[in-house]
């Protein structure tokens, strides 16, 4: 947690979602507990978190993982109120190829999770696509491979319904025609620090700015998210997202793959022209994304 004067370490936990691969509601199994490294390919060391592409649990292939930050008491999901704050992390995307999505995002999940498994077994997930049947507001700080990156706001007409599944996002390749930014200007073979600034106060969010820092240099993408950029004057406005963030969002780390990822890094969104995740999963199961140095606090805190 950071101020302009510096940062102090905060302790917490990571928990996996209730679903592991195709195995649902893991708390119903015997035993229900995970060996995170072996079963879901997740390793934590100090302030560093890695997610591996392929693992095996209960004899079944598990692709990727979805993880939530839990508070220091290990009782509730940690809630973050982002308006007027900055969220920063370093990520190593060097192994994340076409068709793989290394995502870091926030959703308005209930802090106590949901019954019957609660926080302990990763219950309570929701997002703007209503993936598990539960809808809520979602802010994608990063969805990316090493070919393209996008950040996107997804507001909803209410806290639990009517979500804007497409959202309003910014991808330098797609939206500025800057095909060199993510890959050349930013060397994706080296770790990069990504800074997201949520401009506003209280529950009033007016702009979301993005900076990338690498090799001692700061690279601002050409555009930030505003109501003007998004052409949003209804529920899709940043005002709606700001109110949601003021209630508190849970931070999610996700790694998944799909042959239908052209919306993110193919077509007009990126240079990928074909996808074969089955080949990737079999030939490079140990592909991983590594997140580190996660920071949250005052805008313009030390990167």
Protein language model annotation of sequence segments:
Residues 1-137, 142-146, 251, 281-303:
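A long-range scaffold signal marking pre-active-site subdomains of enzyme folds
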Residues 63-69, 153-156, 265-278:
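Short, polar loop/linker segments at the starts of domains and inter-domain junctions
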Residues 68-72, 118-188, 230-235:
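Glycine-aromatic-enriched beta-strand/loop faces of beta-sandwich-type recognition domains
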Residues 8, 13-14, 162, 169, ...:
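Secreted/processed peptides and extracellular or luminal domains of membrane proteins
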Residues 58-62, 148-150, 260-264:
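Short, solvent-exposed loop/turn elements at domain surfaces
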Residues 77-83, 165-190, 240-244, 281-283, ...:
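Exposed beta-sheet edge/beta-hairpin loop segments within beta-rich domains
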Residues 2, 110-114, 120-125, 131-133, ...:
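Aromatic sugar-binding interfaces of carbohydrate-active proteins
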Residues 26, 52, 66, 174, ...:
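Arginine residue identity/basic-tract feature
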């Amino acid at each position: 947690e950071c101020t302009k004067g510096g940062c102090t370490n905060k302790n917490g936990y990571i928990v996996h979602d209730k679903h592991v691969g195709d195995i649902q509601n893991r708390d119903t199994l015997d035993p229900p507990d995970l060996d995170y490294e072996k079963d879901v390919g997740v390793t934590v060391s100090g302030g560093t978190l890695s997610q591996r592409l392929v693992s095996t649990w209960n004899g079944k292939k598990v692709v990727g993982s979805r993880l939530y930050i839990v508070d220091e008491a290990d009782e509730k999901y940690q809630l973050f109120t982002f308006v007027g704050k900055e969220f920063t992390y370093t990520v190593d995307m060097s192994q994340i190829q076409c068709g793989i999505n290394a995502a870091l995002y926030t959703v308005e999940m209930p802090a106590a999770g949901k019954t019957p498994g609660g926080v302990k077994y990763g219950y309570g997930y929701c997002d703007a696509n209503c993936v598990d049947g539960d809808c809520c507001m979602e802010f994608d700080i990063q969805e990316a491979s090493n070919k393209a990156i996008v950040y996107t706001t997804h507001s909803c007409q209410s806290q639990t319904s009517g979500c804007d599944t497409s959202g309003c996002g910014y991808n330098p390749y797609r939206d500025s025609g800057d095909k060199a930014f993510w890959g050349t200007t930013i060397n994706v073979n080296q770790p990069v620090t990504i800074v997201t600034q949520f401009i506003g106060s209280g529950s009033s969010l007016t702009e979301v700015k993005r900076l990338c820092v690498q090799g001692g240099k700061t690279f601002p993408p050409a555009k930030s998210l505003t109501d003007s950029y998004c052409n949003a004057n209804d529920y899709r406005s940043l005002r709606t997202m700001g109110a949601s963030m003021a209630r508190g969002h849970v931070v999610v780390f996700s790694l998944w793959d799909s042959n239908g990822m052209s919306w993110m890094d193919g077509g007009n969104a990126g240079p990928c022209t074909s996808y074969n995740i089955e080949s990737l999963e079999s030939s490079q199961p140990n592909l991983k994304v590594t997140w580190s140095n996660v920071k949250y606090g005052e805008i313009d805190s030390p990167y």
